[in-house]
From Swiss-Prot:
Gene: argH
Assigned EC number: 4.3.2.1
Protein name from the UniProt record: Argininosuccinate lyase
Localization per record: Cytoplasm
Alphabetized InterPro entries for the sequence: Arg_succ_lyase_C (IPR029419), Argininosuccinate_lyase (IPR009049), Fumarase/histidase_N (IPR024083), Fumarate_lyase_CS (IPR020557), Fumarate_lyase_fam (IPR000362), Fumarate_lyase_N (IPR022761), L-Aspartase-like (IPR008948)
Organism, scientific name: Sulfurimonas denitrificans (strain ATCC 33889 / DSM 1251) (Thiomicrospira denitrificans (strain ATCC 33889 / DSM 1251))
Pathway(s) where this gene product acts: Amino-acid biosynthesis; L-arginine biosynthesis; L-arginine from L-ornithine and carbamoyl phosphate: step 3/3
Keywords: Amino-acid biosynthesis, Arginine biosynthesis, Cytoplasm, Lyase
Signal peptide feature range: none
NCBIfam families for the chain: argH
Family annotation (PANTHER family): ARGININOSUCCINATE LYASE
Length: 460
């Protein structure tokens, strides 16, 4: 018999069709989930009296042998078997005989692959969460050392207001916390079992879907079989979650690339996580963050690809959804190595506070503080204070100095209401620590934020 479904066909499938139709060379990644799902299904069938105890024992032992063969590398994956389900079932039947032919009772490949793929995605949601926690812990280690390290905060990539380096890193902790929450939310929402839905409409066999759901670690069985066998929201969600996470990684990577340049010198990546040039001997290139930026686009492509596959599929299952796996596999693997290498690159990175502080003396970072002084101390409306401060900035430009270094006499020429106490407002350090509102950049508020993220990770 050529194919397990070949009964109604009079001709053998062409080798070209085998090559085009087969998914076995990539969906075999799901062999653990497939074997575990089959054991759970067989266990339920035996409890329901559809299989005998002896048949269950044969199937369980046979599947264990198949698993050992796969993991030892002796299992032969054949294109002609079409997919891993058929490959494993054919090998099982070759080992144990007729009992293997009974395994597929009350089951379709439609619900079988939905179980396998869903369980893989659920597992990867949690593994990525664990990797994100490790990354956040590493960022916390760095941030805890730099709550007083001055850094120019920017908008439009222009110097805006002074902040501290830990506060800047805390912004990424916020992003990665949201990523964790998205993965965890997806896990909870999608933790339902498709097993027993069969092709699309359930089965007349007296099965127990709740039993298999419990055996496989699902929260419950799904509600509607028609939806369940064709649902790939769980795959789209992990792709979206990874895409969003990679976007956050890419933003940090962009800053690492800039900060490691001679124009900034805020950080230096270690030799272990840098590369050189084939022609320019002096080069030390930030290939890790550059590749992280590039791989973000690759993950986006997987998300858009699956969205496009799914956008016009009628209910229920269609072969189009075979195209769901490679993009997810690739995105997951990209996410895993990206999180690991970013963590290690940060761990070995050298922070250069001196250059960060020097950069705070460029761009008149205390301009807003002068405006605030005029409002608070001189009772000047903010819009007028904004205009006066602009004049002070222009004067500083004329003098070729930073606003934080301007002498009182020049400020009084602009507005005589300005007094000597303004100089404390213009201090870069004081400016950073003046922002004491909740979520602000003062050292005290930054330390509160770091404690918040530390507690978040402890509670997870």
């Amino acid at each position: 018999m050529d194919k397990m479904w070949s009964g109604r066909f009079s001709a053998t499938a062409s080798s070209l069709l085998d090559q085009f139709n087969a998914s076995i060379m990539f969906d075999r990644k799901l062999y653990r989930e497939d074997i575990e799902g089959s054991i759970a299904h067989a266990t339920m069938l035996a409890k329901q009296g559809i299989l005998t105890t002896d048949e269950l024992s044969q199937i369980t032992k046979g599947l264990s042998q198949v698993k050992e063969e796969i993991e030892s590398g002796v299992f032969e994956w054949k294109i002609s078997d079409e997919d891993l389900h058929m490959g494993i079932e054919k090998r099982l039947t070759a080992i144990i005989g007729d009992a293997g032919k009974k395994l597929h009772t009350a089951r379709s490949r439609n619900d079988q692959v939905a179980v396998d793929f869903r369980r893989y995605v659920l597992r990867k949601n949690l593994e990525i969460v664990d990797a994100l926690k490790l990354l956040m812990n590493e960022i916390l280690v760095i941030a805890s050392k730099h709550t007083q390290t001055l850094l120019p905060g920017m908008t439009h990539l222009q110097h805006a207001q002074p902040i501290n380096f830990a506060f800047h890193l805390s912004a990424y902790l916020s992003m990665f916390k949201r990523d964790i929450e998205r993965f965890e939310s997806s896990y909870k929402r999608n933790n339902i079992s498709p097993l027993g839905c069969a092709a699309l409409a359930g089965t007349p066999h007296k099965i127990d879907r709740d039993m298999t759901a419990e055996l496989l670690g699902f929260e419950s069985a799904s509600i509607n079989c028609l939806d369940t066998v064709s649902d790939r929201d769980f795959a789209l969600e992990i792709l979206f979650n990874i895409s969003t996470m990679m976007m956050h990684i890419s933003r940090l990577s962009e800053e690492l690339v800039m900060w490691s340049s001679y124009e900034f010198r805020f950080v230096e990546l270690s030799d272990e996580y840098s590369t050189g040039s084939s022609i320019m001997p002096q080069k030390k290139n930030p290939d890790v963050p550059e590749l992280l930026r590039g791989k973000t686009g690759r993950v986006y492509g997987s998300l858009m690809g699956l969205l496009t596959v799914m956008k016009a599929l009628p209910l229920a299952y269609n072969k189009d959804t075979q195209e769901d796996k490679e993009g997810v596999f690739d995105a997951v693997e990209t996410a895993e190595i990206s999180l690991e290498i970013l963590k290690e690159a940060l761990k070995t990175m050298q922070v250069k506070p001196h250059y960060m502080k020097n950069a705070c003396k460029i761009g008149h970072l205390s301009a807003t503080d002068l405006a605030d002084y005029l409002v608070q101390k001189c009772d000047i409306p903010f819009r007028e204070a904004h205009f006066i401060t602009g004049k002070a900035v222009a004067k500083s430009e004329e003098l070729k100095i930073d606003l934080s270094d301007i002498e009182l006499k020049y400020l009084k020429e602009i507005d005589d209401r300005i007094n000597e106490d303004v100089l404390a407002f213009l201090s870069i350090e004081n400016s950073m620590n003046a922002r004491t509102s909740a979520g602000g950049t003062s050292t005290k508020r930054t330390e509160e934020q770091l404690k918040y993220f530390e507690n978040f990770l402890k509670a997870e």
